[in-house]
Amino acid sequence: MKTKLNIYNMQFLLFVFLVWDPARLVLANIQEDEAKNNITIFTRILDRLLDGYDNRLRPGLGDSITEVFTNIYVTSFGPVSDTDMEYTIDVFFRQKWKDERLKFKGPMNILRLNNLMASKIWTPDTFFHNGKKSVAHNMTMPNKLLRIQDDGTLLYTMRLTVQAECPMHLEDFPMDAHSCPLKFGSYAYTTSEVTYIWTYNASDSVQVAPDGSRLNQYDLLGQSIGKETIKSSTGEYTVMTAHFHLKRKIGYFVIQTYLPCIMTVILSQVSFWLNRESVPARTVFGVTTVLTMTTLSISARNSLPKVAYATAMDWFIAVCYAFVFSALIEFATVNYFTKRGWAWDGKSVVNDKKKEKASVMIQNNAYAVAVANYAPNLSKDPVLSTISKSATTPEPNKKPENKPAEAKKTFNSVSKIDRMSRIVFPVLFGTFNLVYWATYLNREPVLGVSP
């Protein structure tokens, strides 16, 4: 019984093998034939599309206006150059339009092609109005994509790196904000022939990759879109504009400029607490702080374009410079009105005492010599003896002479001007900082959106 079952199983497996293997080969041949047929059909469609196609003529020539729908995907934004007033942006630039000459029928609805086909059909002659330099990436092949739908709608995408102008108004620098435009349109076709339209709304027509910001000194606040028409001697042209809104980060400038300026002003006010007679020390404080402020003002301007107006940082540095220079002038004023105490307070009193003692000693010596010379005669003459005794006897009621008071030394005296400066200078500088930072930090960013 078991032997019969094994025989039946072997026969069944042999039957399946003999039947399935030819069927598999037939299916493989059918799929291969279908692939070959698809390639053949694909080639025939392309050949038929290009048969008699003139890529020198725009779609709808003499009949309708060609509408080009555009949108931008930003893969990298930055860096931004303040000195050159320009920025660099890396984008996928997408254009979409309809060409009735490229309609087709076939087993597929979309033909996915590369850059080779793009050179054989009409494409918009788009250029960037404010672009200084534009590069189309060609590694390892030209980064271009072309898709043709069966109704003649084309999608043309390319990867570009654009270096564009960004006009900046630096009155509020470094608390400033800017709107950098990216303008593009047709170079040869006027609005009566080709017009551009944003594909989506503002948030979708221009998108920035989440990790696309390459900015060290700015925050990318967002973007907006616009459209305008410009007139020239050759006609009216459509110009599409995308604005990228930037707000400068102030941290770098606080560390590099603001804090050193504040510390320099505070250092200049330390001289008010030194003795007014300490001329060398106060002179070093004044001259050093003035030179430091000069160096800071020069270095702060190196990273900026040579504009003809003063920025917010320039005003801050100018006021700090005024405080430092005023401290030096204050010392000069105090020094001018300071009396030299060591020239008359101490030495003149000592010299007067020495002169007085010398005159007394001379008088005593003369008196002693006279007494010695006349002593024998005094002893002989009773009248002279009596007169001598009466002359040498001091008067009991004579009051001692008052000694002249020593002049008060003024070596460690403090000037009234210094006392006032210790209060006035810090209060004024603190008030200035309060008004300055409250004004600029609470101000809404003004984005100069050019038309």
Curated annotation (Swiss-Prot):
InterPro entries, per database record: GABAA/Glycine_rcpt (IPR006028), GABAAa_rcpt (IPR001390), GABBAa2_rcpt (IPR005432), Gabra-1-6_TM (IPR047024), Gabra-2_ECD (IPR047023), Neur_chan_lig-bd (IPR006202), Neur_chan_lig-bd_sf (IPR036734), Neur_channel (IPR006201)
Positions annotated to bind 4-aminobutanoate: R94, T157
Extracellular side: 29-249, 301-311, 442-451
One BP term from GO: synaptic transmission, GABAergic
Activity regulation, free text: Activated by pentobarbital. Inhibited by the antagonist bicuculline.
Signal peptide annotation: 1-28
SUPFAM superfamilies documented for this protein: Neurotransmitter-gated ion-channel transmembrane pore, Nicotinic receptor ligand binding domain-like
Stretches in topological domain Cytoplasmic: 271-280, 333-420
A matching Pfam family: Neur_chan_memb
Keywords: Cell membrane, Cell projection, Chloride, Chloride channel, Cytoplasmic vesicle, Disease variant, Disulfide bond, Epilepsy, Glycoprotein, Ion channel, Ion transport, Ligand-gated ion channel, Membrane, Postsynaptic cell membrane, Receptor, Signal, Synapse, Transmembrane, Transmembrane helix, Transport
Transmembrane stretches, start-end: 250-270, 281-300, 312-332, 421-441
PTM: Glycosylated.
Cysteines joined through disulfide linkages: C166-C180
Annotated phenotype, changing N377K: Found in a patient with epilepsy; uncertain significance
Glycosites: N38, N138
Any GO CC annotation of this UniProt entry: postsynapse
Reaction(s) catalysed by this chain's protein: chloride(in) = chloride(out)
Function: Alpha subunit of the heteropentameric ligand-gated chloride channel gated by gamma-aminobutyric acid (GABA), a major inhibitory neurotransmitter in the brain. GABA-gated chloride channels, also named GABA(A) receptors (GABAAR), consist of five subunits arranged around a central pore and contain GABA active binding site(s) located at the alpha and beta subunit interfaces. When activated by GABA, GABAARs selectively allow the flow of chloride anions across the cell membrane down their electrochemical gradient.
Medical condition linked: Developmental and epileptic encephalopathy 78: A form of epileptic encephalopathy, a heterogeneous group of severe early-onset epilepsies characterized by refractory seizures, neurodevelopmental impairment, and poor prognosis. Development is normal prior to seizure onset, after which cognitive and motor delays become apparent. DEE78 is an autosomal dominant form characterized by onset of refractory seizures in the first days or months of life. Clinical features include severe developmental delay, hypotonia, microcephaly, cortical visual impairment and profound intellectual disability.
PANTHER family named among the record's database cross-references: NEUROTRANSMITTER GATED ION CHANNEL
Summary of subunit composition and partner proteins: Heteropentamer, formed by a combination of alpha (GABRA1-6), beta (GABRB1-3), gamma (GABRG1-3), delta (GABRD), epsilon (GABRE), rho (GABRR1-3), pi (GABRP) and theta (GABRQ) subunits, each subunit exhibiting distinct physiological and pharmacological properties. Interacts with UBQLN1. Interacts with KIF21B. Interacts with LHFPL4. Interacts with SHISA7; interaction leads to the regulation of GABA(A) receptor trafficking, channel deactivation kinetics and pharmacology.
Comment, domains: The extracellular domain contributes to synaptic contact formation. The GABA-binding pockets are located at the interface between neighboring alpha and beta subunits.
Full protein name: Gamma-aminobutyric acid receptor subunit alpha-2
Organism: Homo sapiens (Human)
Lineage of source species: Eukaryota, Metazoa, Chordata, Craniata, Vertebrata
Gene label: GABRA2
